[in-house]
């Protein structure tokens, strides 16, 4: 029986070659979308977060939806997702981002969404049985939100919230928000914006929290649609001060996301900006990714030309992930052709271990992953110990890429 099981693939390969067909080369990721993700080819799935909603020890998927109700996809333990309709209500909103954390300290993960045009941010408390209770009234304010980050910024052990605001419409402010968890009432928030953030009317699309200067607290990188991007240092108590002298911004950028991770392997976090040429309009700015390398003391120098391939597509989202299992962080990014807003194949860039990246798309990403790729989430969905990627889509099918032995 073993000999037969080995011989059959060889026969199939030989038959394919004899007929003039070349077998498709295997890629690091397998596109499991058709069998594992609920079909929704016109959905605007702008972001996703992985969290074990129902306590069965696998990762479920929470999806932020623009122009529809936010979604919950339950995992069967093998990465096959089923839509639990109405988990976050049925009202349509303009949700842009989603994150999960245990805000009320009950051991169950809660979910926060930020919304743009309708300013309908939403907050749901996790409940037993994989259910959620709407607690949106606990959020301190409404805004035209486009960025979201969660982390303990004041050292009290509770998750706090940063909302990045765009203020692109008349009468709306681009002042970003800082909401501190209320230690006296876990699951409630105190608006610390006025006392803790610079008073700046920005056009923020993304926010990242990380210890940039090595002092043990969470600092902030702000990604803006209109320049400049910003670096804010934390005083340890959750009060932030901008330090533009630490951020080497050599060209004007229209940035959608900031990622903070150790690209160069020196133990210090670096900053990656994912950029557009314009928001689906004409060609304006250089959309190539920018990698700013930490000098070890919290100052960041733009070394993009030496470390990243030149590209011309626009990128609304991406993620660092070790897809080749060598211990350093590679990159998977969405690509959209602008002008035109035309869908493109997802792209992959391999890290050589020192922060120099080469295009590995053909070896890593299945060719059918063409779409307007949006927010991504990374985690082991199918329980094989290997990280997978859920990729949102703007008016194209959200995708699930299952990792193989090379992606850990």
Identify the role of each PLM range.
Residues 36-66:
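Beta-strand-rich domains and repeat architectures in extracellular enzymes and scaffolds
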Residues 46-55, 96-105, 145-155, 205-214, ...:
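Beta-propeller blade termini
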Residues 59-65, 111-115, 161-166, 220-224, ...:
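Hydrophobic beta-strand segments that make up the repeating blades of beta-propeller
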Residues 375-408:
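Blade-level signature of beta-propeller repeat domains, shared across WD40, Kelch, NHL, RCC1
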């Amino acid at each position: 029986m073993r000999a037969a099981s080995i011989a059959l693939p060889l026969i199939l390969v030989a038959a394919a070659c004899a007929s003039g067909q070349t077998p498709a080369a295997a890629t690091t990721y397998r596109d499991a979308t058709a069998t594992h993700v609920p079909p929704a080819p016109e959905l605007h799935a702008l972001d996703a977060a992985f969290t074990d909603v129902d306590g069965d020890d696998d990762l479920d998927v929470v999806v932020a939806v623009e122009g529809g109700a936010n979604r919950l996809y339950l995992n069967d333990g093998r990465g096959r997702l089923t839509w639990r309709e109405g988990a976050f209500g049925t009202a349509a909103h303009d949700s842009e981002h989603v994150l999960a954390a245990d805000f009320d300290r009950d051991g169950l993960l809660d979910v926060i969404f930020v919304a743009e045009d309708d300013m309908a941010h939403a907050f749901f408390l996790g409940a037993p049985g994989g259910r959620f209770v709407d607690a949106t009234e606990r959020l301190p304010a409404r805004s035209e939100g486009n960025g979201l980050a969660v982390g303990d910024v004041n050292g009290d052990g509770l998750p706090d919230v940063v909302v990045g605001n765009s203020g692109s419409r008349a009468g709306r402010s681009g002042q970003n928000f800082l909401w501190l968890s209320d230690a006296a009432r876990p699951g409630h928030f105190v608006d610390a914006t006025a006392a803790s953030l610079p008073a700046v009317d920005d056009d923020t699309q993304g926010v990242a929290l990380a210890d940039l200067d090595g002092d043990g607290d969470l600092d902030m990188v702000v990604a803006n649609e209109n320049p400049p991007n910003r670096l804010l240092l934390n005083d340890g108590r959750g009060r932030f001060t901008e330090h533009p002298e630490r951020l080497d911004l050599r060209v004007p950028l229209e940035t959608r996301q900031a990622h903070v991770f150790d690209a160069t392997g020196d133990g210090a976090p670096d900053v990656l900006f994912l950029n557009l040429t314009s928001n689906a309009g004409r060609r304006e700015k250089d959309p190539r990714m920018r990698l700013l390398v930490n000098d070890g003391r919290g100052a960041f120098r733009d070394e993009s030309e030496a470390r990243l391939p030149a590209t011309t597509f626009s990128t609304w989202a991406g993620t660092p992930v070790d897809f080749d299992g060598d211990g350093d962080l590679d990159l998977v990014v969405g690509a959209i052709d602008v002008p035109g807003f035309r869908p493109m194949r997802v792209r992959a860039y391999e890290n050589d271990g020192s922060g120099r990246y080469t295009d590995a798309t053909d070896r890593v990403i299945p060719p059918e992953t063409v779409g307007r790729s949006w927010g991504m989430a990374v985690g082991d969905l199918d329980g094989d110990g290997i990280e997978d990627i859920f990729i949102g889509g703007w008016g194209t099918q959200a995708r699930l890429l299952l990792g193989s032995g090379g992606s850990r």
